[in-house]
Amino acid sequence: MGTAAGLLLAALLLAGTSWAQREVNIQQGPLYRAEGSQISIWCNVRGYQGPSEQNFLWSIYLPSAPEKEIQMVGTSDPSFSYAIYSQRVRSGDIYVERVSGDHALLHIRQLQEQDAGEYECHTPNTDPTYHGSYSAKMNLHVIPDTLTVSSPAQTLQKVEGGSLQVTCEVSQNSSQHTHLSVSWLRISGGEEHEIISLTQNLSVRAGPTYAQKHSVGDVRMDKLGDSTFRLTLYNLHPSDQGEIHCVGTEWIQDPDGTWFPLTQKRSEGTSVTVQPTDKEFNVRLETERRTYGAGDMASLRCIIDAQNPAERLFAVSWAFNSSLIASQSPGGVPSLTGEYAKREDRGEVRVGKDSDIVFSLKIFHLRPEDSGKYNCRVTERERGPSGELIDRESKRPKNIPISVLPLRTSLTVTVTANSSSVLEGVRLSLTCSVASLAGPQSRISASWHLQDKQGRQREVVRQDRDGVTWAGEQYRERLGTGELRLIRSGSDTFSLELEGSQRTDTGSYECRVAEWVPATDGEWQLLGERSAQANVDIMALETGFAVTAITRTPGVSYFDSFDLQCILKPHYPPWVGVSVTWRFQPAGGGDTHDLVTFSRAGGVQWGERAGSFRGRSVVEKGDSTHTVKLSVSRASDSEAGKYQCVAELWRWEYRGTWTQLAERASNLLEIRVQRPVPRLQVSKVTRTLSVVEGSQVTLSCSIRSQTGPDSRFAVLWFMRQPSGADGKLIVRSNTGMEYGTYAEEASLKGRLQLEVTAPGHYTLTLQGAHADDSGSYYCQVEEWAMDPNQAWYRLAEEASGMTEIRVRVPDANLQLDQIPRNVSALEGQSFTVTCHVLNRTLPDSRLSLEWLSWWAGHMERRALVRLTVDGVTILGSVEEENVAPGLPSRMQVSQPSLGLYALTLRGTEVQDTGTYSCLVQEWLQDPRGQWYKRTEERSGATYVSVRQPDPALQLDSSLLNVSLMEGGHFDLDCVVSSRSRPDSQLAISWSLQGASRGAEQETLLNVDRSGVWAPMAPRWEGRLQQLQLSPTLFRLHVPRVGQGDSGNYTCLVQEWLQGPRGNWYLLAQDESLIGWIRVQSKESNLQSTICANDALFYLVFFYPFPIFGILIITILLVRFRHRPTSKPGEGKNGVPLLWIKEPHLNYSPTCLEPPVLSIHPGTID
């Protein structure tokens, strides 16, 4: 038990570490809130599974019924709320705000007294299993609102510089520990400003706009008594006027330590007006004009309109585009920032105070970047109680925009090129002309830029205003070697020269010229820039480079001559090198190889595979140096093929090296060298020969004409079978005799004979024709001649007409019985199927026979047994799946008579059911003594049905109705009235359907066909006994019965039969209801038994009374009649009297027999 508990605890710990646990959290309580205020309670869930958006259900448990849940509001079902809250939910007084998928807030806008209670937040389960917490609770207390805030409404008129006092009554009467905070507010122009506050922590805090005044003591707050608070303002200013309110707030500390405002109230306002003294002032900003040129001077004046300016303190700040550039103290001391401080040092900018009311900003040398908006801000300052300056009021006028126009140049630039299209390698020259300079003091700088065809731009070369020249990164090497030059002619011309122009020099050339003038600070100022462009295209040397090959004699005969010409275009200057190579590809195929090459220096070099071309070819170069001719004599097949001219273009570099620019290949010239026209003719006569196997066949081949008297001939004999597309070589005759592959395959070597009966007449004789020799035969003649290279070549070939040979075999005449039959057999018996050969092709032919079957449930055919032509019996492949083992031993093949074959199968099984037939093959002997299959035929099908015995199991259906007392016993009989076969075996199963309603059927006892009992339920263990009184009678004895044994008892019998292979299978089963058994308790056994049975009732309560009465009367009469003469205690003749000692009732345990009343002898006292 301890081990099991440990394993269970370990499993729970493992599950806890591997499964996520849902956890619901709610805001910590208890919380105290005032009646009429609003509240928000948060709730979240974590560790859940399922969708990311969880639902939240809020309920309340009222103090009056702490166990009763009242549904308030939820996120999933609008009808979740109970009637007491549904109206407030619909009106929006109570609602749930979803912060995220697993976080929500419950809002109650106006708390009521009945809202106090225990709040529960519940999240419905979305996990596969229940694991963790699904709800959390907190308490809310709603307390009365006892806060009071009051201040008399009044209107006060004050003068600037005066003082002000206002009082306010703030009190509370709460049963909880709360704190009060008091704030004074001023409302002016719709805006609310905090003056001063006493926080719940009893600290004083001034508002942002009154922090300065509070620091100097002009604002203070005093507490008079328990609930009176007084505000005092000194040194009033017009900005202090407005409506002043007192705000009281009651605070309570929540369990998490934070302070929460229970309630807040505001008093009526006190209207305050502060009459200002005459201290107003205005500001103006002036300038002479708003548009200037670069280098001009601009002056801006900031003018103050005020009373007694000499006695007042004004500070001025200057701004450009809203950025501070300078400031002046009331004493006129300037302070400039950033770049303007540097310009002040150089004397370009000055800030001054012209008078008490005029402040100026002067810029002596304007720049274009000085364009923008200028402004000044005037701030009046006053001295505080401690002597420090305090900003009183600040004003600024409207912005003044100033535009500074830059100086413009009047340059004009033009670019010209020596040519818009330049051949690669030729010098490129461009000229940039400049006109209309600003004056003698101005200087110019120039730069050349190139934009290629891809739109990429790069700098070529540059010369600054001092005449210093440098090249771009990609042109520095060419500048150093002198290929790149920038030449300035006078003061207005810049020439760009590029020696050995390259393809990359193609593009748009831009000349950029900048004009500079001296600035006031000694530097040079850019006055303007102009540019012009010119497009230059550098034509590659290979542009238009082409090679063409021509010939006048594309076709020649043996021993003729032919010429080939290679033409180059265009004409190039001498410094351009050209090399030419003739290439050749033989007509018979193979790789193209070089024949001869003219180098750019004029040398001639033959290729390694030139071969015979050297002895019969002449190479010439034309006077124009652009034509190369190749002449070939004594043409043969070796010179037939495709010729091609390949030219290479080279350029001499300034470094002293050659660079290959291009390679061009000409068109292909095919030279055909023709052989003599053949005049070979072979006889085309066609014949058809039909012979019988073993006969001799003679074929002939005749040449009618030939090309020349010196021709030689080779004769090839072919055979083409009807199913073949191409002929197969049999034999070849030339100077000797060569057998083809077909002669080997068809064993023709020993049966062939070749003869030349006359010049041009050839014969082929075939001895002992076979059936396989059938087909079409023909000869093919090859004519051979000698070429110019003294080599024999095949000049022509021609085939003769077809001779069709048909070698006959006897016609097939095999016939079998095709009548279908049906055979039926019981399992374990045998059946026989027959195969009858009605006719055959030849009497001496041989037969082979194969028995086939198609068993039920199997689509494929199976071969059972085969009888060869030699009479050998061979078993078929019957080891397939689901085939009964031992099948070969059960089969027997016999031949009862000539042409009749039989297959007998013993010990049949149901699996043997199927279709049976025989397949017969007829074999004949050919001339070579070999047996070959002539034909085959399949007999008609015989359907065999193997069936099991018909089931005949039946049980007796007599029913019993028995009542008996608790503790008794009863017997049940299961009678088999009929069975299928005497040798079958029976299995018995007893079951009980209990008397209680809904009880399931219970198996009491299972006894298999061998008499082995199956394990029983614990309550039946040792109580049941089964007896087999006969082969068909089974009795179940049940002792010590109880009330739980009441119900319907059923007997189930299974009949098992042994199959041919010794295996037992279930043939039939039958179930019978035996009867109803009622078991009664002992407490009410006599009364209930008698009352439940009519026979017992009359036997006990009716029949005994008259019987007892008659017996008593008879005994008394006899006793009194014989008393004087008899002995005491004796009857007549000394026999003792009978006395009724006690009547006995014997009850049958099964209550099937009426009780028996018996009288026992006794003594009379």
From Swiss-Prot:
Topological domain ranges for the Cytoplasmic compartment? 1117-1165
Instruction: Spell out the InterPro entries in the cross-references.
Output: Ig-like_dom (IPR007110), Ig-like_dom_sf (IPR036179), Ig-like_fold (IPR013783), Ig_sub (IPR003599), Ig_V-set (IPR013106), IgSF_V-set/TM_domain (IPR051102)
User: What residue intervals hold the motif EWI motif?
Assistant: 250-252
Quote a single Gene Ontology cellular component term: membrane
Q: Where are the transmembrane segments?
A: 1096-1116
Localization (cell): Membrane
Q: Which SMART domains match?
A: IG, IGv
Q: Which PROSITE patterns match?
A: IG_LIKE
Protein keywords? Disulfide bond, Immunoglobulin domain, Membrane, Repeat, Signal, Transmembrane, Transmembrane helix
Pfam families in alphabetical order: V-set
Q: Which residues form the Ig-like C2-type domain?
A: 22-139, 144-262, 276-386, 406-527, 545-661, 678-800, 810-934, 951-1067
- Domain of life, per lineage: Eukaryota
List all disulphide bridges recorded for this chain.
C43-C121, C168-C246, C302-C376, C432-C511, C566-C645, C701-C779, C835-C918, C974-C1051
Which stretches of this protein does UniProt put in the Extracellular compartment? 21-1095
Its main subcellular localisation, reduced to a broad class, is membrane
What residue range is the signal peptide? 1-20
Q: How does it sit in the membrane?
A: Single-pass type I membrane protein
Question: Could you tell me what this protein is called?
Answer: Immunoglobulin superfamily member 3
**Gene name in the database record:** igsf3
